[in-house]
Amino acid sequence: MTKEIIKDAEERMKKAVEVFRQELAGMRANRATPALLDKVRVEAYGSEVPVNNVATIEVPDPRTLVIKPWDRSLIKAIERAINASDLGLNPTNDGQVIRLSIPPMTEERRRELVKVVAKRTEEQRVAIRNIRRDANEQIKKLEKDKAVSEDESKRAQDEVQKLTDKYIKEVDQLMAAKEKEIMEV
């Protein structure tokens, strides 16, 4: 019984870390990556879809993204979506493709981004701790209902704590790597 609780907690912690990893990938650092456009949604064919569902995104050099729409009639819609996003990038289009030049970030903007990363990291730590709390409550309920012994309950809670420590450490490592990437000039 406790094995299922531990397995469920680990799955949920893994998902939390993966979501965090994707969120960090979408944060702008000093180089162009297609992940920058993950949150940009384009009005196309009567619905809003991610840019990468209607175009190919290439990185010809570290400071440029090239967006090649599969349907050229979407160029204006993609341009509008990028302008409406909070990326602070100015698209230029030549009728065939859209180019995004990634300007170097100011020191102030880098510091702001580091603060955002720290805030998101803390949110992920809290999410992981909440998963731990839920798992421990389920284990304690089993113990209270005499479904498992006190020793088994303690062992399971220790296992959940080890998982918590492991995933919080992983989140901290992701944060450190992203901060280093952001502060690179």
UniProtKB/Swiss-Prot annotation:
Responsible for the release of ribosomes from messenger RNA at the termination of protein biosynthesis. May increase the efficiency of translation by recycling ribosomes from one round of translation to another. GO terms for biological process: translational termination. This is Ribosome-recycling factor. It holds the Pfam family RRF. It is found in: Cytoplasm. GO terms for cellular component: cytoplasm. One of its GO terms (molecular function) is ribosomal large subunit binding. It comes from the Bacteria. Signal peptide: none annotated. HAMAP family: RRF (MF_00040). Belongs to the RRF family. Keywords: Cytoplasm, Protein biosynthesis. Its main location: cytoplasm. The keyword Heme does not apply. Coiled coil: none annotated.
